[in-house]
């Protein structure tokens, strides 16, 4: 398939009990299929008190459930989905959408050599930038439901 797979948007769901920079923030994500894989764009606005900070964000395999970061499961990893017992963790097997905050907003893009399979997914925003060796990015702060 080529063309838009999904466009989802709305208020971010809070995954932390304490007040944070994404309380009241909104996001839009769009995933487009192409001949060589897919391209994802994430736009977040309404971020408070975090200008100059970089946050990790990733497509996750499970749903976005307010107050329950674990419900989002792990990162969507094409190797894991394919049943690979030793999956590679990288920006080629996962959708990493790190963004820097400027004037209360951030934008990220990712192009990957695969097309994510449909399901009840989410984009999760993490407390830290993604570690490119481990794929980790700290605590889960907020999420956006992505279903197709």
Tell where the protein language model's regions lie, with residue ranges.
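N-terminal leader/targeting pre-sequences
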Residues: 1-148
């Amino acid at each position: 398939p080529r063309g838009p797979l999904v466009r989802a948007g709305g208020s971010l769901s809070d995954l932390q009990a304490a007040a944070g920079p994404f309380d009241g923030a909104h996001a839009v994500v769009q995933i487009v299929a192409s001949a060589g894989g897919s391209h994802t764009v994430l736009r977040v606005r309404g971020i408070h008190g975090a200008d100059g900070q970089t946050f990790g964000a990733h497509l996750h395999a499970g749903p976005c459930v307010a107050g329950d970061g674990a419900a989002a499961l792990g990162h969507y990893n094409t190797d894991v989905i394919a049943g690979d017992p030793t999956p590679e963790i990288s920006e080629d097997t996962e959708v990493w959408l790190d963004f820097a905050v400027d004037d209360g907003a951030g934008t990220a893009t990712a192009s990957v050599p695969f097309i994510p399979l449909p399901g009840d997914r989410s984009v999760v925003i993490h407390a830290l930038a993604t570690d490119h060796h481990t794929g980790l990015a700290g605590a889960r702060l907020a999420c956006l439901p992505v279903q197709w």
